[in-house]
Structures are given as C-alpha cells and as structure tokens.
Amino acid sequence: MASNSEAGGSADYETLMSTSDVELLKRAWRNEKAAPEILQYEGALVDRAKEQIELVEETIEDYVENGIDPLVVSLYQMDLDRAQFLLRSYLRVRLLKIEKFMFHNLNSEEAERRLSEQEKVFATRCADDLAKHFEETVLLKLPENYQSVLKQSLISEVDDMVPQPHLDTFVVCRSKNFVSLNLYEEGESPETVEMERGDLYFIRYKIVKRAIESGQIDLI
C-alpha cells in the first residue's frame, strides 16, 4: 500500500505535467528545424518552459531528499530531460540560422522582427566580427570598388553577396484543418491546393509559409 507521501507525489506529478507547453515547444522546434528561414521567436513559450524546468528540478531535489518513490522521481527526470532537450535544440537551431543568414536577418525588417533582443545582439556581433575579419584579411587588399562585404562591387544595386534562405525549398507538412492555398504568387495563376486535416503534403515552403505562421499547418 502506498504511503501518503508517495501518493501525494503521484498526484503532484499528474498536476505538474498536465500541461501543453512541452507539446507546444516540440511543435516550435519541429517547425524551426524544418523551415528554411528563421521563424518568429516563441518568447512567452520559452519563458514558461524555463519556469517549468526550474520547478521540476526543484521538485526532483525535494523528492530525493524526502525519500519519495524512485519511480516517481524517474518519471520527473524523464520529463525534465525531454523538456531540456527540446528547449536547447530549439535555441540551437535558431542560432545556427542566425549565423548562416546574419546579414539577411539584420537587413530584412521581417526577419529582424522575428529575433529576440538577445538574438539581435548575437547577430550584430557575428556580422561585425565577420566584416572585420574579411576587411583585415581580404577586402582592404582589393580595389576600392570591391571592398564591400555585402555587394560584389559598388555598382551593384542590391546586396548580391548576402546568403538568403531558399523559400522554394520543398518541405513536408501536415494541416490541422482544411486549408486552401494559392500555388503561385499573386497575379501569376489562380490555381490552388486544398489540404485536408491530418494529411501529409510535400510542397514548396513559400506556399505554406503564412499558414505556418498562423498555426494552421505544422512542418514535419
């Protein structure tokens, strides 16, 4: 027969872990990992996940000190490990995209709005360090017209040396509900694709981009 403390521990476990934040974090991680561009930073979700992780860590320490059933402790530890993995992986994927597309993320208003304040600082430092490195090792040795980090030459009208995300990349996605999307850019063709709830689709990212942002579609 379980002791009162063990029974209480089990009840607390059910209460603490009956949250959708871990599933939301998993969704954010999957979308971020599969998308060719950086997505909107899930600040509120990350903050809640950090608070939950701290709470579970404190709970584990308390249960170990009070001799709670090791099985209950192990359940907490598994959920803690899962939450920590998802959070770290989510943030790591974003940092990799910031490093890869640092100039694009800083020069594009849409991309910059998706970054957290800390990510903006990180992107700025990365861009400054890379620009300084190029200037010291290569650019200052070239003719003046070719000393730009962003352009092939000063006569270029656009930043043609800046790597950008390939939005034409094909992705695998699942629709949460029935969705009808245009297959082409506005003014090109009225052809649409109808996506049924729960079905998987292999489709160009830019077609489902807005539906992903609105939460109608998840990447796999």
UniProtKB/Swiss-Prot annotation:
Annotated Pfam families: Sld5, SLD5_C
Alphabetical keyword list: DNA replication, Nucleus
Lineage, uppermost ranks: Eukaryota, Viridiplantae, Streptophyta, Embryophyta, Tracheophyta
Family listed: Belongs to the GINS4/SLD5 family.
UniProt keyword Nucleus, yes or no: yes
InterPro entries to which the protein is assigned, alphabetical: GINS_A (IPR021151), GINS_bundle-like_dom_sf (IPR036224), GINS_Sld5 (IPR008591), SLD5_C (IPR031633), Sld5_GINS_A (IPR038749)
CDD domains: GINS_A_Sld5, GINS_B_Sld5
Gene that encodes the chain: SLD5
Subunit comment: Component of the GINS complex. Interacts with EOL1 in the nucleus.
Matching Gene3D superfamilies: 1.20.58.1030
Species of provenance: Arabidopsis thaliana (Mouse-ear cress)
Signal peptide boundaries: none
UniProt-annotated location(s): Nucleus
Designated name of the protein: DNA replication complex GINS protein SLD5
Null mutant phenotype: Embryo defective.
Function of the molecule: The GINS complex plays an essential role in the initiation of DNA replication. Required during embryogenesis.
Primary location: nucleus
Gene Ontology CC: GINS complex
GO biological process: DNA replication initiation
